[in-house]
Each structure stands twice: as structure tokens, then as C-alpha cells.
Amino acid sequence: MNADTAPFWRRKTLDQLDSKEWESLCDGCGLCCLQKLEDEEDNSVYYTSIACKLLDLQTCQCSDYPNRFKHVPDCIQLTPGKADQFKWLPPTCGYRLVSEGQDLPAWHHLVSGDRTQVHEQRISRSGRMLSENDVDEDDWEDHLIFRAG
């Protein structure tokens, strides 16, 4: 495949993407919306199976994406300018992969044309999460699922 016909994520840097291209890199896994805990001794970040109160536990989509910062002031906004901080994202994340110069996986909707693959391949935590509204914060350590990085 020559450079002119290569997909945009192979031809452009993150800073060159337009807003539609940027948003399309999101595979819809919802993992970035899981609550994370940081180990105070070594600064490791651990993902829990506890989801943000706005995350739909089946579709892995934010229930109020346009207004999320009003409801969750510390919601993380990914931008190309923060690419050097993407190491905390899951290794399957499109933003992280492209920022590291890697290709998107075969199941990613931009490659497969099928947005359900992220769930069918069990990349997302669809149906395997709990809402933060249902778990006391003191119990989050009981729900660790993987270490970031």
C-alpha cells in the first residue's frame, strides 16, 4: 500500500488529525472510563472493573458525553498534545497505538468496519463491570483487573 492510499492513522501524526479522525480512533472499549488506583510505592496504575457512573455497562459508551465534564469534573480528556502521557491507556487503545507508531488491530472498527468486534473479541469489559454507584470506594481494591503500562 503506498502512502497516498494508506489509512489516515498511518499517514498522519496525531497532531495532523482532524476532529472526526481523532474521535474515530476510539474503539469504544470504555476501558479509559474505568476507575484506576495508583500504587503509592511505585506509582503503578491499576485498572479496576468499576466504571464511571456515566458509562453504560453494556455498550461501553458514555451516557452523557457532551456534558460529561459537568457531571464528572475529573473526567479525562484525551488530546494529541497529551500523547506522551498515553502509557496509562490500555495497550489495545487506538490513541496509544497510533501515538507509539503502531497499527490498529484487526478487530478495530476502522480496520474491520464492525463496531461490535471490540465487544465480541472481549477487548471491552461489556457486561463485566460494576458502576461506581454500586461499590464503596474502600472496596475498589477488591476489583483490580490489570496494571497499566
From Swiss-Prot:
Signal peptide: none annotated. Coiled coil: none annotated. InterPro entries: Puta_zinc/iron-chelating_dom, UCP006173. Disulfide bonds: none annotated. Pfam families: CxxCxxCC (PF03692). Belongs to the UPF0260 family. This is UPF0260 protein PSEEN4031. It comes from Pseudomonas entomophila (strain L48). The lineage of its organism: Bacteria, Pseudomonadati, Pseudomonadota, Gammaproteobacteria, Pseudomonadales.
